[in-house]
Structures are given as C-alpha cells and as structure tokens.
Amino acid sequence: YGMYEVLANLNDIKTVNVPLKERFQIDVKSVLSAVNFNTKLIFICSPNNPSGNLLQINDIKTLMDEFNGLVIIDEAYIDFAPNSSFISELNDFPNLIITQTFSKALAHAGIRLGMCFASERIISVLNKIKPPYNVNQMTQKKALEVVQNFDTYLVQVEIVKSEREILVEEFNNINWIEHVFPSAS
C-alpha cells in the first residue's frame, strides 16, 4: 500500500521497497537481506493491496521470527479473505502489530477510523505518542452504530464475496483475458 511510503517520506523516514516474488508473494530472503541494524519495522499488506492475494502464513511467521523489529500487518481487506486474521498470533509474536480499518468491509471510509492490535507493551508506547482527542465525536458515534449493527455488516461481506466469485467467472469467460489471479480482497 503506497501511502505508507508517502507518510514515511513526510516524516523524513527512509524506506526500502522489496519487490514481491512471482504470484505476488513475499521474498523472505530478499526482505531479510534488505534489513540492517537501523531497520525498525517491516510493513506487510495481507491481503495485499493492490494484488488482492493473501501472503503465505509461513513466510510472515518467518519474518516475525527472524526480524529483530516490529512486523506490521495491514489487514484492511481481511474480512473478505478465506483465512482469518493474524490477531490470534499476537501472544506468540511480541513484535507483531496488526492494523484494520472501518473503510473496506465495514464500508465507512469517510470516518477515517482504524484499529491497532498489538501486545500490551506496544499499545502502551503507542498511547504515549498518539495525539490527544485523536478520534472525533462524530466518528465515535458512527463507529458505535456500525458495531451495534454488526450482523448487517456480516451479511454485506458475504454478498461482496459472492459477487467477487461471479466477477471472476465472468472474467474467465472473456477470451482475451489470459489469466485471472485469485483474490482474497
């Protein structure tokens, strides 16, 4: 997701991009060889944006095991994926941070609200550096409405997943389209 690099540049933070392998998977060797003692974190999108595929679980776990810094997984599209979130791995990986959003599956991009899941230690640090009153009253109200109507959200996600499969079938019927990659977003 390109906005991470934009935000890093605005804050004068050096970034290193490591291209994905064929089939849009993490090149673990290349990532680990690109990091050094100054590298503080690795950002991963899974499902990936823009390719839409899930990254291989074992590759992500290898990065979390072998990298001596924070591994941040952007799960903005996880609700559309067949696999579940990495949230269940938080107790096993103290260097893991997971971000999610109200923008995609919850269909509330306009309220600009996200969630961060991490160890108590990491959350404690983040709470010390976040701006005061960082979520306005209108956003809080709308988010509460969404959470209180969660069943509606679950139905909407299933409809989107079903429509995605229909779209893939239709793309596969177009003779000039050479290949339709699977999508988890």
Task: Describe each PLM feature range.
Residues 15, 34, 173-185:
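Short, intrinsically disordered, charge-balanced linker/junction segments flanking boundaries
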Residues 9, 25-37, 50-105:
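Active-site pre-lysine segment of PLP-dependent enzymes
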Residues 1-44:
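PLP-dependent aminotransferase-like
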Residues 15-19, 41-47, 71-74, 181-183:
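Short beta-strands and strand-loop turn motifs
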Residues 20-22, 46, 101, 120:
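Active-site donor-binding loop signature of nucleotide-sugar glycosyltransferases
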Residues 45, 79, 117:
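Conserved residues at the C-terminal ends of beta-strands
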Residues 95-172, 179-180:
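PLP-dependent aminotransferase class I/II
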